[in-house]
Swiss-Prot record:
Lineage: Bacteria, Pseudomonadati, Pseudomonadota, Gammaproteobacteria, Aeromonadales
Localization: Cytoplasm
Job description of the protein: Catalyzes the reversible formation of acyl-phosphate (acyl-PO(4)) from acyl-[acyl-carrier-protein] (acyl-ACP). This enzyme utilizes acyl-ACP as fatty acyl donor, but not acyl-CoA.
Keyword Lipid biosynthesis: yes
Organism of this sequence: Aeromonas salmonicida (strain A449)
GO cellular component entries: cytoplasm
Protein name: Phosphate acyltransferase
Keyword Cytoplasm: yes
Length: 339
């Protein structure tokens, strides 16, 4: 059984070690082949690690980092001045080959800037993209990218995103010949701006893709496609809107019982049971694709169960050697395209 080693920034995020350390315990219990390198300030974490039995755990080692990237730090400042931060160190461990992947719940902008600087892009990748798996009505998951790494893109970049997203759907989600769609304001070929229509032409001409056309925002969770491609501005707005709707529904379901009728309480109970699969914790972890290493960004407010899922995602991507798979596919697609 092959092992996967994941470097974890235990200082990152809004909550920090009080949730990342219990997440480590959970992940180790779920994945016997997992090894973890915990990176953080030893003075702040030693007691907590000892409390959870991790200081002497055979599959855990600790690396001290004297700095922490704050959630409000500017990416360029963090990149230049926080070279011994827990975030930077986990990336260095991946670059050095000591870790197969890394996870951080820290500042998204800083993580993207550091990851691009430390790990560099794969050959043929103009811009890395953030990708995330989403629940669907079919029970399967759809992957969507870009979710905020690039607020503007050209058609060639969206084609690269489509190819990378297809590899993730195949290797990580186990979907054969994944259906690829462009997010648009309508399904008809005449709909959308010049970028979307030009991108559709490129995707349609790419024999390596199973391109099925356009998908509208209200069909993202339908399960009609397996890979949804868009620029980072559109993708981030769509994702944040969906997260807000789920939070609103959850809050409505949890409305104080004494203020609800019997039918209202029954409806709330049924909602929680029927739609538990919508819990964002189950889908925590967005991957920064297109780099020479695996980087998973956990939600900044993620608690232990959600953080555990981000760790497991990183291990799964490492198991499938995702960067190598993406590099091979891109080389195949674009060498054929140049002929």
């Amino acid at each position: 059984m092959s092992t996967q080693t994941v470097a974890l920034d235990i200082m990152g995020g809004d909550i920090g070690p009080s949730e990342t350390v219990p997440a480590v315990v959970q992940a180790l219990s779920l994945l016997p082949q997992l090894k973890l390198i915990l990176v953080g300030d030893q003075h702040q974490t030693t007691a907590l690690l000892q409390q959870h039995g991790l200081l002497t755990h055979p599959r855990v080692r600790f690396v001290h980092a004297s700095q922490v990237v704050g959630m409000g730090d500017k990416p360029i400042v963090a990149l230049r001045t926080l070279k011994d931060s827990s975030m930077r160190v986990v990336l260095n461990l991946v670059k050095a080959g000591e870790a197969d992947a890394c996870v951080s719940a820290g500042n998204t902008g800083a993580l993207m800037a550091m990851a691009k600087c430390v790990l560099k892009s794969l050959p043929g990748v103009d811009r890395p993209a953030l990708i995330k798996a989403l629940p669907t009505l079919s029970g399967k998951r759809t992957v969507m990218l870009d979710l905020g790494a690039n607020v503007s893109c050209d058609a060639d970049t969206l084609l690269q995103f489509a190819v990378m997203g297809s590899v993730v759907a195949e290797k990580v989600e186990g979907i054969a010949s994944p259906r690829v769609a462009l997010l648009n304001v309508g399904e008809e070929e005449i709909k959308g701006n010049d970028l979307v229509r030009h991108s559709a032409e490129l995707l349609r001409q790419c024999s390596a893709l199973n391109f099925v056309g356009f998908v509208e925002g209200d069909r993202i969770f339908s399960g009609e496609c397996d890979v949804i491609v868009c620029d980072g501005f559109v993708g981030n707005v769509a994702l944040k809107t969906a997260e807000g709707v789920v939070r609103m529904m959850a809050q409505l379901a949890g409305y104080p019982r004494k203020k609800r009728s019997f039918l209202g309480r029954l409806a709330g109970f049924m909602f929680k049971r029927r739609f538990s699969y919508l819990n964002p914790d189950q889908y925590n972890g967005a991957s920064l694709l297109g780099l020479r290493g695996i980087v998973v960004k956990s939600h900044g407010r993620a608690e232990r169960h959600a953080l555990c899922n981000a760790i497991l995602l990183a291990a799964q991507e490492a198991k499938h050697q995702l960067p190598l798979q993406i590099a091979d596919r891109l080389e195949s697609v674009f060498s054929d395209r140049d002929l």
